[in-house]
């Protein structure tokens, strides 16, 4: 970058390695610029949620250092104000370092320190990125702390609420369609009747279990490494620093699930809680794929597909075929599922990279975990409000398919036997007749084992779908 900058476009900054040319208007300084030049890899930086968490963390640390007397009030207040500015998203463009950087996140920690120092200077207060902004801290405890703050915030404020919107939408449809009968399908082949409500109740239960899985990770996800400094021992800070910073973070975020790590060596050397959280999101992605794919298949058509439900028309589906409308949100959801599952694979492997006192794959773990949470939260809301809420069932068509399915012969097993029932199914299919007519034609209504009244009762497709047990969703 610096090779192309003119005299007017850059300024000279320095660090312990010497002078560096930095863009004149940039708030970052020397160490950030070195990282920008060292890591021109993907063009993707940190998630905004992580930048926010870094800003809040620096503000919290400054407040604790001010309260203890370690940092004078003027400098501390300048750092706090700058940290909150960063947390607001105002300075996201000042965080240019690629996600594929040093595995501890040191570059991004220093990026935060330098931007805060520059904001403070612009407001008339001189603070040093290391001596003041980073006081009592190390990249090895700040970056994982910010990652867990951001992930916990994402889970509590975005992901869980988004999933609850989807669950409510699916559960509403489950209740609404409790008497809408259709053919069940196993192996993509006709099976005994179910109701559309039962299917959507199953989907709602999947999402509810996903919510519970995420909630179950929070006690570990909310543990913060701050206070461990370089290697977990807390060198260069006080024993109560971590706990006090966490208390400040709770005040700043209103996320009550945050707490100081119970073991600072585990909190810096391992990222198991991120792996666990990512795993919970992977399960949700698998659930979402199944739900979206089922809905897409049920809505296929309009003439040559299943045509059991009508999906909302959201946008034209083809640049060449007039009038075509596609299941775009089903395809969106399934693509998101693929991305989240892929992200989880990277997170799981990255979790293995904790050698001795530090995991050194944290930036990519943070990016993937936060992206997965954002994708699932947004997709859940949109899928619910723009798709599920607008689905209309084709009740007559579904009932017709259910009644024509060979599998409705199943309740006749106890009256005529399995082999005779199988013959009925095959004959009806081969001759294009209903199961009822085939039973009569084969002389199986004998007035003893099976009467015509009993036959009609056993072939009531809605009655077949009803179950005595309660199914929670």
Swiss-Prot record:
Involved in the TCA cycle. Catalyzes the stereospecific interconversion of fumarate to L-malate. Pathway: Carbohydrate metabolism; tricarboxylic acid cycle; (S)-malate from fumarate: step 1/1. The record marks 331 as: Important for catalytic activity. GO terms for biological process: fumarate metabolic process; tricarboxylic acid cycle. The keyword Cytoplasm applies. It is an enzyme of class 4 (lyase). One of its GO terms (cellular component) is cytoplasm. The active site is at residues 187, 318. Belongs to the class-II fumarase/aspartase family. Fumarase subfamily. This is Fumarate hydratase class II. The gene is fumC. The keyword Repeat does not apply. There are 2 substrate-binding sites: the catalytic A site, and the non-catalytic B site that may play a role in the transfer of substrate or product between the active site and the solvent. Alternatively, the B site may bind allosteric effectors. NCBIfam families: PRK12273.1 (NF008909). GO terms for molecular function: fumarate hydratase activity. It catalyses: (S)-malate = fumarate + H2O. Substrate binds at residues 104-106, 128-131, 138-140, 186, 319, 324-326. Homotetramer. Its main location: cytoplasm. Keywords: Cytoplasm, Lyase, Tricarboxylic acid cycle. Its EC number is 4.2.1.2. It is found in: Cytoplasm. Pfam families: FumaraseC_C, Lyase_1.
